[in-house]
């Protein structure tokens, strides 16, 4: 028996859909996000539901059509599930009008709309104790209704020769075998349903180009799918596959294959048959080995095997000479093969959070890379001159490794770099002149190292915008810091600083100054010149008084002076018209607050815990900060203002 033979043709009137559904099918439907797969405007590039970009350097991938626009990420560590909830509803049936919010009443009304009022059956509602909302006694039947609507949609698809059918997000549990009659289909979107298996008849769709099955409950695929030999894009993300279904290896026309977020443990040698693949995503599975077959995929431009359990890569990876994006982050890699140097088209290489202790010198051949990120490994040094050879780099991230010194290669290695992150290493010195060619360097993170001093040429870092030197052993800031006049963020917390130079007042663009947990006793009067300052953190020092000039910080919203030795607050604090948060808790010598504090009309939070405020009645203090402010206002000479 021929599975693909057509059944009786239903009349058009019995299969008509809503006008909205028809418009969406004829016009291409509403645009979908990458996870869902719905497309828009008839454009196949955005309709295949498979435009997933890999994020080599940050969190999970963002589904966009332009891979290069989001690949470098930088956010979180883990790969987040692709968000498909923003996709507009584009179901190809009229089920949305009857199954979305109308289960109880709509089905009843369809059969009774023409009855006279006295003969219509009553719909009884019951109020449950836990809810004030009346609930119909009729049971919801959304899946049943959805499956019925699928049958209608398939009939219409057959009768009208529709080429693109979107049944996504329709609570479908079963695909009817009548799908075989939709032989004109080139695009079929079934993502975000409850499908556990596909019918054998799916193989009758011999013209199919795009098939989106992501976000279902599939554990296998029927062998008949091999007859869809024109299939180019197959999306199986977020299913329950324990292996790559063998039939996939026979789909020789595939160019894009998404298998992210399944339960796959092995990749068969038959993978070598998919020679037309340009994009392969195996992200977030349980794969421990990637065999030599990967080397046969010479047309690959994007390979994502991040968030697996790989310990090694085959040398054959060097045969994939067209690769521009290779994401290996969050595996258990112990080494990288020398053949990676053959990948001269490589722009993005994700190596974050593995178990590497070194990288091969051959990486210097990958001159197209614009970002180098090996965060979260155990690397102690880089091959001599490697960074200098990669002269297209703009971002270098070596954080959370075992570096004890800056990479060798001199100033040339940072010529075009604007962002350097060496956080959480064991570096005790920034070499003099190391940034002499880094004219574009705007962000340097040296947090959690072993620095005891800053280089004498710090005054040449004139384009620096953000400087993080927290958690080191710095004892002094050089006066030349005054030259960093583009600085907006300066983090110096957890050091051993005893004073701040007067030249700090030259940093007129500073928005954030963090001096928490040092040994500072006095702030310079020039602090009042920082008119753009929004956050000033002085917590856990030895400060006895704030300078009166602090009242000039008109943009200040956050001031923390807790855990110090304050004896009083200056009256000028009442001039901080933008102040929202004030922390003065745990100052054992602070016995009174200035009445002027009540003038801070935008103050939302005041922490005065463990301050012996003898001038304010205990019952007022017990009432909380808002009551304290009211008391100050009522007893101040400004109460009429």
From Swiss-Prot:
Domain of life: Eukaryota
Bias-annotated ranges (Low complexity): 1-21, 82-100
InterPro entries in UniProt: Leu-rich_rpt, Leu-rich_rpt_typical-subtyp, LRR_dom_sf, LRR_domain-containing, LRR_R13L4/SHOC2-like
Positions with biased composition (Gly residues): 26-43
LRR repeats: 161-182, 184-205, 207-228, 230-251, 253-274, 276-297, 299-320, 322-343, 345-367, 368-389, 392-413, 416-437, 440-461, 463-484, 486-507, 509-530, 532-553, 555-576, 578-600, 602-623
Gene name, Swiss-Prot/TrEMBL: Sur-8
A Pfam match: LRR_14
Family: Belongs to the SHOC2 family.
Cellular component annotations (GO), alphabetically ordered: cytoplasm
Function as written in the Swiss-Prot or TrEMBL entry: Acts as a Ras effector and participates in MAPK pathway activation. Probably acts as a regulatory subunit of protein phosphatase that specifically dephosphorylates Raf kinase and stimulate Raf activity at specialized signaling complexes upon Ras activation.
Region entry Disordered, spans: 1-147
Keywords, alphabetical: Leucine-rich repeat, Repeat
Keyword presence, Repeat: yes
SUPFAM superfamilies reported for this sequence: L domain-like (SSF52058)
Biased composition (Polar residues): 101-114
UniProt protein name: Leucine-rich repeat protein soc-2 homolog
Species name: Drosophila willistoni (Fruit fly)
